[in-house]
Structures are given as C-alpha cells and as structure tokens.
C-alpha cells in the first residue's frame, strides 16, 4: 500500500524478495529516491505514485517528483495514480494525459467500486484499476461521504468488467488476515494491495 509507514524503500527491499511490488508514497522526495538507489533496491519492484493535483496546478509537487523519478530511473515500470474517490472527469482526463506521456508504463489508477468506472478508466488508458472505497484500515471515505461498496461485491463486479475490456483490477483495502487475500483472488482480483496488515511491523 502507498500509505505512510508501509510504502517505503525499506519495505520494498524486503517485499521484492517475495516477488511483491511496493507503491512508494507520493510524499517521497526526489532526494529520497536518489538516496534509495544503490542500496539493493530493485527499481522494477517499486511504483512511483502521484495524485491528480496537476490538473489544477501545473507545478504540483507529486507530478514534478514523478516526472523526475521516471527520468532518473527508467527501470521503474509502474505509475500509480491514487485518489480517495476517482469518480470525476479530471481523473479520466489525467489518465489520458499519463498514458500519452508514458505509453510504455504500467498505469494503476483508483480508487473505484463500480464496473462502469472500472471500464471507463481502462478504456482511457489504465492497465490496472484499484478497487475499494472505504474498506481500508485508515480510510474515512465511507464515513465522511457515504460512498462505498462492500469489498467482495465490488471485486466480483469490477473484475468481470475489467476482463471484458482487457484490463486488470487490484483489490485495495479490507484485508485483515491471510484469508481475506484468498477471498479477493477468489472474487476475481488479479492483484491485492495490503497496508494495515504490514503497518507497525519490522520489515
């Protein structure tokens, strides 16, 4: 998960030994990326992360960081576009912008919980759509806005939609024990993102 305390380089160096990806938090600076290089970190095993602020501010810090990281480390193959609730036109426009700028990168985008929006993001350039609004251990979106769908139901519906348009989904949130990961895969998820299960543990 790209949550603070989990989406770190120290975590990535452990996770890469188990063939797992780590999404580095979008608050990570270019200097921190530089410092991580040469420490045994495999850049193919991490994703750079950005929000959509650049749609409002061309000098957005996470966008500028992402561009610099991808220039310095071409082995970083994955870009994660992370917003709490992806149900707005700016998100779709941003995915188009990213795909045009980086045609050969794997783009992960989210979060959504409905098949229609899953299809929309994939059709407009996302390779993988993150599924989950509310189930995460530190997520407050359902509480604050009332938006959300039970996680297993969302996975089942969205995986079917993604398969229909040649994309993939990543189940994000709600895993508190190993069985939850198995349920997500059983429901059709191609990948599962975990955060809370790793939070507070030594790498």
Task: Kindly label every feature range from the protein language model.
Residues 167-201:
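Active-site capping/gating regions of soluble enzymes
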Residues 1-168, 196-201:
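Active-site entrance/lid segments in N-terminal catalytic domains of soluble metabolic enzymes
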């Amino acid at each position: 998960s790209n949550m603070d305390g989990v989406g770190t380089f120290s975590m990535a160096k452990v996770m890469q030994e188990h063939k797992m990806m780590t999404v580095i938090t979008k608050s990570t600076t270019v200097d921190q990326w530089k410092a991580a290089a040469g420490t045994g970190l495999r850049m193919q095993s991490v994703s750079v992360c950005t929000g959509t602020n650049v749609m409002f501010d061309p000098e957005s810090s996470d966008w500028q960081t992402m561009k610099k990281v991808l220039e310095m480390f071409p082995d970083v193959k994955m870009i994660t576009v992370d917003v709490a609730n992806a149900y707005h036109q700016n998100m779709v426009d941003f995915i188009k912008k990213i795909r045009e700028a980086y045609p050969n990168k794997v783009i992960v985008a989210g979060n959504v919980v409905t098949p229609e929006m899953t299809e929309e993001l994939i059709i407009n350039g996302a390779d993988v759509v993150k599924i989950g609004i509310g189930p995460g251990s530190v997520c407050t979106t359902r509480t604050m806005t009332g938006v959300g769908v039970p996680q297993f139901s969302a996975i089942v519906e969205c995986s079917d939609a993604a398969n229909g348009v040649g994309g993939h989904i990543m189940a994000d949130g709600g895993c508190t024990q190993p069985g939850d990961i198995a349920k997500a895969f059983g429901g059709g998820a191609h990948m599962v993102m975990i955060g809370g299960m790793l939070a507070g543990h030594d790498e």
